[in-house]
């Protein structure tokens, strides 16, 4: 009996001692306005414990006591806060206030990790600063590296998403949709993107299943938010930068007071140095210049005024001289030589402006009136004659000699004005948004194009009088239309299940549902688009998120899709088809996110499966970046695939990722099933950053792309003849940068905050990627597809000054 009593006493003492070594930490995480922050991360690295705050900002952790316990609180867009508990016992309560992180230049300083709870993924812009890029458009280059996104032209900022065309991607800046030039047909003509990376605060991007607020496009949504500078005292905040490279120069300056934020940027780009590496030699004179300003004025907590102004003047002048291209197989190499006369002169002038007034009625309710105006005047003019020779390389046998002449006088003017009334209201677990907008569209086009060759494209005996017109088009059109759009959506965040003893083990749900409607008086069509998405963070699996989305998406027709053609006496006439209907895509998406740590580095693995049922499609062909539509709803189809992405700190303090995309697309046209023109069966992208051992002043950035080639056929043929596929797109860009000065962490500040030097090797392995094909016919009538290659290996030097 005494032995039993002794054993019981020892066990009781041991239990009490063990209980004394544990304690419970609970509390709440809020922002500066005392609003709860849901899904904030509370972690104790020394004990490997992590908790995610509830919808009310509450958290609870069971921890082991020690002399000191370090607790870290982090949330996307907010400064990370660390608290140290000294010999904690029993129950500890800790309420933490997180403050918004300041932003500098084009960098979003984020230490925490946001849990994706919808179909919009947030991209960090800090890696754009010294990343190698041939097109100079940092945001689009970042988007092109994402899973499900592809590009086959390093000179272009355009991209395809899950089998969609370039025109199926919507872009918003501060809740206002922006437009791209209409007449651009090649990456060489493209200038600077309207998105200015120096002004960007947040980037949201979705490859499908996005909410009702994101317009009538059926492939992707890119949501850009510009930053504002705010002084903490009466002393103004000033920041700026100067950047220069062999491809252009940029200047940026920002001013912030307690009420006013004013950002300004001037950018200049020239690609003549880069284009000099192409096979077509000549005098390239591309010059692109733009200016952008963003003014935000908030006199008090109730009112806010925002203005964005943008002017862009892009010139592309080109006088070709000659080219020589070798193509074919190792056993059968052919040579294609051309000597040119003539020139091309293009100009793209664009004005864009937005004005927004916001009334904040309460902390949870606001009403905004947004107005915007877009104007573009574009001209494309060229007269180019080429005399070509097609030869067998080994035997020197001449397969064809000919002359061709290409002529174009294309003029287009477009004006789009819009007004939008937007209401946002938050009540308990609901975050609602509704808007109605009116658009006025006016477009005028006057185009003449033709191409002719002697002797039907090859040299044979003839009477000297006949010229064969390969292609001839005339278009004189005017569009005047009004478009009305409206949407309403709600984001409902709630928790389910029974909480455990910590009060924190519940399943978290984020449900977004909404409906969108629009009417266009040109074709008198009304479309309605319901959309739904759900994200689940399971109890006891807080590092896992399951995502599901479905919705009906329409591609509302605009000017390009309207152009229908008819041929009379060998001349093709383009007119606007008033009977055209919106293309339709039904999205079904299932996604999986898993967050984990290896050592001290954070990683995230994401996977998505999708299926898109396509209907009312308007067939189109792609040459370079020019998309030509058939102008009629003629086919249906599908796109299905898998996207994988591994993201994290492969090297401490840096962000890197690897993505893999697998896809299958088909459309049924003329009773035949064929791939979509953007069918890319596989794509692999790698973005990797690293520091030199022992020094963070030296940094390396590497971009790798390996993607399947796209289907193609001879020009001016039916799409059913798309029986060929281009070679795979393979490219590697590497950049090395050295931080000459880093004054950001010094107590005594100087005028210059950061100085960085860099050198890039673009197309590191010198791979000849095919952009498009030029078709030549020999004396036997056999056609040859002569590849038009993109840029070769080239070096670029850069310098960046920040103050």
Residue positions per predicted region:
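Short, acidic, small-residue-rich periplasmic hinge/interaction motif at the N-terminus
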Residues: 30-33, 40-45, 72-79, 88-132, ...
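Periplasmic N-terminal accessory/gating domains of Gram-negative outer-membrane beta-barrel systems
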Residues: 79, 86, 92, 115-169, ...
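Transmembrane beta-barrel wall of Gram-negative outer-membrane proteins
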Residues: 238-268, 281-319, 344-369, 373
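Surface-exposed extracellular loop regions of Gram-negative outer-membrane beta-barrel proteins
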Residues: 273, 321-326, 539-588, 609-629, ...
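Face-selective signature of the C-terminal outer-membrane beta-barrel domain
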Residues: 298-314, 343-523, 606-609, 657
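Membrane-embedded beta-barrel scaffold of Gram-negative outer-membrane proteins
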Residues: 366-372, 579-633, 638, 757-762, ...
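Gram-negative outer-membrane beta-barrel transporters
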Residues: 493-496, 610-613, 630-713
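C-terminal beta-signal and adjacent terminal beta-strands/loops
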Residues: 653-656, 705-713, 738-803
């Amino acid at each position: 009996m005494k032995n039993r009593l002794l054993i019981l006493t020892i066990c009781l003492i041991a239990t009490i001692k063990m209980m004394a070594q544990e304690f419970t930490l609970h509390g709440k995480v809020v922002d500066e306005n005392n609003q709860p922050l849901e899904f904030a991360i509370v972690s104790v690295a020394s004990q490997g414990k992590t908790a995610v705050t509830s919808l009310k900002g509450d958290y609870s952790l069971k921890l082991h006591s020690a002399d000191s316990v370090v607790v870290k609180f982090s949330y996307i867009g907010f400064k990370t806060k660390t608290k140290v508990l000294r010999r904690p016992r029993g129950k500890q309560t800790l309420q933490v206030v997180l403050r918004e992180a300041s932003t500098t230049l084009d960098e979003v300083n984020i230490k925490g990790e946001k849990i994706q709870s919808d179909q919009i993924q947030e991209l960090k812009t800090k890696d754009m600063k010294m990343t190698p890029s041939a097109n100079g458009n940092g945001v689009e280059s970042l988007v092109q590296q994402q899973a499900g996104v592809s590009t086959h032209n390093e000179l272009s900022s355009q991209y395809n998403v899950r089998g969609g065309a370039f025109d199926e991607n919507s872009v918003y800046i501060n809740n206002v949709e922006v437009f791209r030039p209409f007449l651009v047909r090649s990456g060489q003509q493209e200038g600077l993107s309207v998105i200015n990376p120096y002004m960007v605060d947040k980037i949201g991007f979705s490859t499908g299943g996005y909410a009702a607020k994101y317009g009538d496009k059926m492939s992707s949504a890119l949501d850009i938010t510009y930053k504002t500078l705010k002084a903490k005292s009466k002393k103004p905040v000033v920041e700026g930068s100067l950047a220069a490279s062999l491809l252009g120069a940029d200047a940026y300056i920002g001013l912030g007071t307690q009420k006013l934020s004013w950002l300004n940027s001037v950018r200049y780009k020239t690609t003549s140095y880069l284009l000099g590496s192409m096979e077509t030699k000549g005098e390239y004179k591309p010059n692109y210049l733009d200016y952008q300003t963003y003014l935000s004025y908030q006199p008090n907590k109730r009112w806010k005024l925002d203005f964005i102004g943008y002017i862009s003047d892009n010139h592309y002048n080109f006088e070709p001289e000659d080219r020589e291209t070798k193509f074919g197989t190792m056993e059968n190499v052919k040579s294609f030589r051309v000597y040119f006369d003539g020139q091309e002169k293009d100009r793209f002038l664009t004005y864009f402006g937005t004005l927004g007034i916001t009334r904040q009625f309460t902390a949870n309710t606001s009403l905004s009136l947004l107005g915007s105006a877009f104007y573009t005047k574009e001209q494309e003019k060229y007269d180019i004659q080429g005399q070509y020779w097609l030869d067998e390389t080994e035997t020197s046998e001449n397969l064809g000699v000919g002359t061709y002449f290409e002529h174009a006088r294309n003029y287009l003017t477009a004006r789009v004005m819009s007004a939008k009334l937007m209401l946002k209201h938050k009540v308990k677990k609901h975050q609602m948004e509704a808007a109605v907008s009116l658009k006025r569209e006016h477009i005028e086009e006057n185009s003449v194009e033709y191409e002719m060759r002697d002797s039907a494209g090859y040299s044979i005996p003839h009477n000297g009088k006949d010229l064969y017109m390969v292609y001839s088009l005339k278009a004189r059109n005017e569009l005047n239309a009004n478009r009305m759009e409206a949407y309403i959506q709600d984001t409902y965040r709630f928790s389910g299940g029974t909480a455990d003893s910590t009060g924190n083990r519940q399943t978290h749900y984020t449900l977004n549902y909404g409906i969108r409607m629009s009417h266009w008086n040109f074709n008198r069509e009304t479309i309605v688009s319901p959309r739904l998405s759900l994200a689940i963070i399971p109890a006891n699996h807080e590092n896992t998120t399951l995502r599901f989305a479905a919705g009906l998406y329409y591609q509302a027709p605009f000017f390009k899709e309207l152009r229908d053609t008819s041929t009379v006496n060998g001349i093709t006439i383009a007119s606007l088809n008033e009977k055209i209907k919106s293309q339709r895509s039904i999205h079904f998406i299932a996604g999986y996110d898993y967050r984990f740590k290896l050592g001290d580095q954070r990683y995230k693995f994401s996977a998505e499966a999708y299926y898109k049922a396509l209907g009312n499609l308007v067939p189109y062909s792609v040459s370079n970046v020019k998309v030509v539509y058939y102008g009629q709803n003629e086919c249906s189809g599908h796109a299905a695939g898998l996207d994988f992405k591994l993201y994290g700190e492969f090297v401490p303090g840096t962000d890197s990722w690897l993505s893999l995309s697998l896809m299958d697309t088909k459309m049924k046209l003329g009773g035949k099933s064929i791939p979509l023109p953007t069918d890319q069966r596989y794509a692999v992208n790698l973005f990797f950053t690293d520091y030199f051992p022992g020094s963070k002043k030296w940094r390396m950035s590497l971009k790798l792309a390996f993607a399947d080639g796209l289907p193609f056929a001879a020009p001016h043929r039916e799409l059913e003849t798309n029986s060929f596929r281009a070679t795979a797109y393979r490219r590697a860009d590497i950049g090395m940068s050295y931080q000459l000065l880093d004054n950001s962490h010094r107590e005594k500040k100087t005028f210059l905050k950061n100085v960085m030097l860099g050198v890039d090797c673009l197309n590191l392995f010198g791979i000849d990627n095919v952009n498009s094909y030029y078709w030549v016919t020999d004396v036997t009538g056999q056609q040859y597809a002569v590849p038009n290659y993109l840029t070769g290996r080239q070096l670029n030097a850069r310098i960046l000054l920040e103050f």
